[in-house]
């Protein structure tokens, strides 16, 4: 049997995933029903009206703050949900919700933005060193042990793989970066391409990638 601390930890893991799913739905639909227990095909809650955005957003934040307080600092082992993972989701959710409220003239924007700032500082203080090779964050067979990686998807032969090689074997890849995405990267001097004296120009891709911060 589990003691109270272990129960609170696993409840926190459940709250994390519920908050993650609700965050995705909130960004799509705004108002939606908030459900706190398992439903069956006969549950009357399937026909509930939508709850206001304020209620859903506050419940998401409440779940995440409970998880932050009660989850094991290092999770249940390597690459599991731990306190830093929860704080990262608090940061991302509150940045989204706070800016949405700010630019749509909704109340309580500052509350979410301040939570974003607080949680972000906690994560930054824990991960003080980042991996120096940006490309390896996307091309490595495993992200285990790489500085700055908070949570990653781990692949295993015959268990969990992906179809990346199939998608990039043709002349026209389905997942190439757009020109806007490439242009959004700063130059090595910290300035955007329009303000940098180190930008190589648009003559070819080699010039575009020269002296960029990646």
Task: Enumerate the language-model features and the residues they cover.
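An aromatic- and glycine-enriched ligand-binding surface/loop that stacks and positions planar moieties
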Residues: 32, 61-68, 80-214
